[in-house]
């Protein structure tokens, strides 16, 4: 019963907010350079870069890795 309620809640959340936070892979030299520099500045290893469209605003998301795992970081100087 609880599992069914949880699945329904997750489905509703993805239905309403599904397009928010979708990150499209970006492998252009600009994306790579900005994210690589951003990860190095944070003392982390660069993994990849993607672009997120939230409410018609494009935002770059850098995926950096350290010993705790891979996490997203958002550079301000795009």
Swiss-Prot record:
What tissues is it present in?
Expressed by the venom gland.
Cellular component GO terms, alphabetically? extracellular region
* Signal peptide coordinates: 1-23
Q: What keywords would UniProt list here?
A: Disulfide bond, Secreted, Signal
Q: Which domain of life is it from?
A: Eukaryota
Q: What does the PTM comment of the record read?
A: Contains 4 disulfide bonds.
**UniProt keyword Zinc-finger present:** no
Q: Where in the cell?
A: Secreted
Keyword Zinc-finger carried by entry: no
Record-given protein name: Toxin-like protein 10
Q: Which organism is it from?
A: Urodacus yaschenkoi
